[in-house]
Design a protein with these regions (language model features):
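C-terminal (or distal) subdomains of carbohydrate-active enzymes
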Residues: 1-417
């Protein structure tokens, strides 16, 4: 947003939304806006109401007792390393970070093969080193109506020292959500190296699962023999899950994760792990083909973390899709009074809680739309499609290409387990 004037953003009932400054530039200040109840497959508009004063400045304080806290989590930081030493879930009564792990939560890990690229051709890792941040500083804490934010800056191998590695931890005020953000400039390096982020979860007897297009995979179990069992490609979420709870991670910029532990033998089969540790793999040049041997430039990425008693794939899928897919927004110019009113509308939603709408496109026939659906928990149910008022909409079951299966128009469809 380009103005520094006092303003409110209000919904159709006149209720003001919470806003929080993110950053300022010469052309103005940018804000985060907390908008709730956005309709599925629809939209919600708000009005911007200007005031006469100036917008409030961000509230900055020092990090006290190395900790942040809200109704859901208590975070204890290690300011010397710019990491999280403890993440305690108050609802579950659980510590989420493994205290015995070599790497704390959020640790920025640089890995080098010490110039020995032939290890990859021999499929062994026996000559390597790993390091984390040095010269770490904490500029302080920013508190707002949406979240509290702690920033750390430090230096790392393979990264521009002047720019540094910048880490931000956000603890949201009213939802069970923690975010980790990273910003650094990668220096060109032809020797084999990689960068990871550490997420050493503590959850007894937990299995690591992740979703791929069309389903959920248990790491090392539900995979075709011989496929990658160390670095997995993740679509929307990774979950550390046992019978009582699950810890969830989602990120939009980094699709590769090493699940289990940082490996000395990443090509080992079959893949097993003792603890549910997760390592997003930010970047690497571990290849032996004729791709460019170095990577360089600024790189930004982020991860969303949550935890819940609900151990279903449905809960994990809803979290992952919501966290990874951005909410599209537009600022519309002022118009007539009627057109500028706040409003909302939903065109379509699923009437079955464990059915996910994965895509919606115009049908090739030019008549209607083709909706791709996925049942997430292997449960029986009744599929219905509802409009904004909750009225059941007629539909025809079709295959993936849009060809009708039987041609009948129905308002419900029985789902088999």
């Amino acid at each position: 947003m380009l103005f520094r004037s006092e303003f409110r953003i209000v919904d159709a009932a006149g209720k003001a939304l919470r806003v929080q400054p993110i950053r300022s530039r010469r052309e103005g200040r940018y804000y985060a806006i907390w908008a709730e109840g956005i309709p599925a497959m629809g939209y919600k508009t708000f009005e911007i109401v200007l005031g006469d004063g100036k917008a409030a400045e961000p509230r900055r304080t020092e990090l006290r007792n190395n900790s942040l806290e809200n109704d859901f989590y208590r975070i204890v930081f290690d300011p010397a390393s710019g990491t999280i030493a403890s993440l305690y879930d108050k609802e579950l009564g659980r510590e989420m970070v493994d205290p015995d792990s070599e790497w704390k939560l959020g640790a920025f890990i640089y890995e080098s093969l010490n110039g020995d690229r032939h290890q990859m051709e021999r499929k062994v890792f026996d000559n390597y080193r790993r390091s984390s941040l040095s010269d770490v500083h904490c500029p302080g804490v920013t508190s707002g109506d949406i979240y509290q934010s702690v920033r750390f800056t430090g230096k790392a191998e393979g990264c521009d020292e002047k720019f540094g590695v910048q880490i931000e931890v956000r603890l949201y005020n009213d939802v069970k959500r923690v975010e980790l953000g990273y910003d650094f400039i990668r220096k060109p390096e032809t020797d084999p190296s990689a960068i990871y982020v550490a997420m050493p979860w503590l959850l007894e007897n937990a299995k690591l699962t992740f979703d791929v297009p069309g389903g959920v995979v248990r790491s090392g179990e539900d995979q075709i023999p011989g496929t990658s069992a160390s670095w997995n490609t993740v679509q929307n979420f990774v979950a550390a899950r046992n019978d009582d709870a699950q810890i969830l991670v989602s990120g939009s910029e980094v699709p590769l994760y090493l699940l289990g532990k940082l490996l000395d033998d990443p090509y080992r089969q079959p893949r097993t792990y003792e603890k549910p540790h997760v390592f997003p793999w930010l970047m690497n040049n571990y290849w032996t083909t004729n791709f460019r041997a170095s990577q360089e430039g600024e790189f930004k990425c982020g991860f969303v973390i949550s935890s819940t008693r609900d151990t279903s794939n449905t809960a994990a899928s809803q979290f992952g899709w919501s966290a990874r897919i951005p909410l599209c927004t537009r600022v519309m110019p002022a118009a007539t009074a009627a057109n500028g009113n706040a409003r909302d509308r939903s065109f379509l939603r699923s009437g079955c809680s464990h059915v996910l709408i994965t895509s919606c496109t115009p049908a090739a026939s030019g008549e209607g739309i083709l909706i791709n659906l996925r049942e997430t928990d292997g449960q029986a149910g009744t599929l219905t499609l509802l409009d904004g008022s909750g009225r059941e909409l007629p539909f025809t079951a079709a295959d993936a290409t849009g060809r009708p299966l039987d041609g009948r128009s129905v308002t419900s469809l029985a789902l088999k387990p």
